[in-house]
Structure formats: structure tokens, C-alpha cells
A protein has these predicted regions:
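A detector for short, charged/polar N-terminal pre-domain segments
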Residues: 1-6
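Beta-strand/loop substructures that line and gate deep hydrophobic ligand-binding cavities in soluble
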Residues: 71, 79-127
Length: 168
């Protein structure tokens, strides 16, 4: 998923996945702390405009991603903005109902930058979402409303990143 750039210097990456469930069920899995913690990383999410979202990428709190919810439109859309390497980074989540009991979940990271210094980092986000969205689809297909634990497994691979992620 290439980085999109506009003339003003705004950049974005996005990823999406089709998952089973109603918009309300999918919203519960992406826009609540207990829901997102089942398939992403341990998280707290205060569901309201002005609320706080915290995603814990390390158990000791050293890699917490803290953001303020600036848009809250359940069960369709929310935006959280936080400080990132290049400055403010906005992450927009949307849920779109489709036929056949499916919904499309889309996440878009947007940031402003005057150089491409952070482009590789954010390009990596889009690849990471591919793997996490596979987990979301598995969770909603086979384990909805069940509790789980998130963990990370690091394994060296001689394959290109995209090939290794596809095999996960």
C-alpha cells in the first residue's frame, strides 16, 4: 500500500479488510478497549469525543501510543489524534456495512511532513495492518466475544516482508 501524498505535504497510508458481523458487532471489536485488545494489542479506549485511546505496544509502557479521540460516530467512524515522529498523526477508523453479513473496516493514518523521513515507518504501518486485520477477521469469524491474550512472536525470515506476512 503506497504512501499517498498531496501538494500540501499531507501523507497517508491505509488498509482495509472485509469481516463478518453487523456494524455494531464490528464496532465493538475495533472501538472498545476489550474488543480491540482481543486481536490487536492491549488497549484502552474511552469511547467519546475528547476521550483517550492508549495502545500498549510493550508491556512496560515504554511504547504506548496515546491519542485523543477527535471524532466519535458509532458505529461507523472514529478518529484519534496523537503525537508521532513527524508531529500530529491522525488515525481514522471506519466501518461500512456490506451485503451478506459483512462489513469493511478501513484504517487510515494521516500526517503532515515536509520531507519523506517518516515515509518508511508509515509504510510499515500499512503492512502491519495486513497481519492484524487477518487476526481481526479470524476473531470475528471464529471467536467473537471470547477473551484472548495478545502476544508477539518474532522469527527471522529470509523472505521479503510481504511474502512472510502473507504466510502468517
Amino acid at each position: 500500500m503506497p504512501i499517498k501524498k498531496d501538494a500540501a505535504g499531507n501523507r497517508s497510508v491505509e488498509a482495509e479488510v472485509d469481516v463478518p458481523g453487523t456494524p455494531e458487532q464490528v464496532w465493538n471489536a475495533i472501538a472498545t478497549g476489550p474488543g480491540i485488545s482481543q486481536w490487536f494489542v492491549p488497549s484502552e479506549l474511552e469511547g467519546r469525543t475528547g476521550g483517550t485511546s492508549v495502545s500498549h505496544f510493550a508491556s512496560d509502557g515504554s511504547m504506548d501510543a496515546v491519542a485523543t479521540i477527535t471524532v466519535w460516530e458509532p458505529p461507523r467512524r472514529f478518529v484519534a489524534e496523537g503525537a508521532g515522529g513527524p508531529g500530529t498523526v491522525a488515525t481514522e477508523w471506519t466501518v461500512e456495512a456490506k451485503s451478506g453479513g459483512l462489513c469493511t473496516v478501513r484504517v487510515v493514518h494521516r500526517w503532515f511532513a515536509t520531507s519523506d523521513d517518516w515515509d518508511d515507518q508509515f509504510d510499515g504501518h500499512s503492512h502491519g495492518w495486513i497481519a492484524f486485520f487477518r487476526l481481526l477477521r479470524l476473531y470475528l469469524t471464529h471467536f467473537p466475544r471470547q477473551h484472548g491474550s495478545a502476544f508477539q512472536l518474532l522469527v527471522p525470515s529470509s523472505e521479503p516482508l510481504a511474502d512472510a506476512l502473507r504466510k502468517l
